[in-house]
């Protein structure tokens, strides 16, 4: 069915979001049209504010509204550990369990030979720079249990082992192919407690 141009454009915009197909985009567009002007203005204002005010922490790469982020500036955290994750959503998932008290490093992607993504295409150089002259004795690799997650963890292990840094991987309480951000808190807690050395 053909929709008026403003609705068609809104549907197109929603459909560009990950996991949103045409049916859901259409539903969201019509829902948005039915919202009050005040709610639509608030929604638009919040979208723009998030886009303009958020940045990536210059230390760990986490999404933040202050640089460095509140995690990197927290002196009570364990300076001997860095937990490496794919993206900022994974930091939030780990923070929810309130059991990990070290620092983080966000890669903003994974090594993916099949997709032409190599180590230089993700945030790995800053991790290596951070580890020079630091008190870090263990790096916990918390990438998803996928082929790309495994490739990334093995690469990190190969690079860091010669420097004498212990490299561990989350235990396999996480199902192969699962995303960390969707795991429940107990599963994440068990995965951290039972991590394995690479």
UniProtKB/Swiss-Prot annotation:
InterPro entries: DNA_Rcmb_RecR, Rcmb_RecR, Rcmb_RecR_Znf, TOPRIM_dom, TOPRIM_RecR. Signal peptide: none annotated. PROSITE patterns: RECR, TOPRIM. CDD domains: TOPRIM_recR (cd01025). The keyword DNA damage applies. The keyword Nucleus does not apply. A zinc finger (C4-type) spans 57-72. Keywords: DNA damage, DNA recombination, DNA repair, Metal-binding, Zinc, Zinc-finger. It comes from the Bacteria. Residues 80-175 form the Toprim domain. One of its GO terms (biological process) is DNA repair. Pfam families: RecR_C (PF21175), RecR_HhH (PF21176), RecR_ZnF (PF02132), Toprim_4 (PF13662). One of its GO terms (molecular function) is zinc ion binding. PANTHER family: RECOMBINATION PROTEIN RECR. May play a role in DNA repair. It seems to be involved in an RecBC-independent recombinational process of DNA repair. It may act with RecF and RecO. Belongs to the RecR family. HAMAP family: RecR. This is Recombination protein RecR. The lineage of its organism: Bacteria, Bacillati, Bacillota, Bacilli, Lactobacillales. The gene is recR.
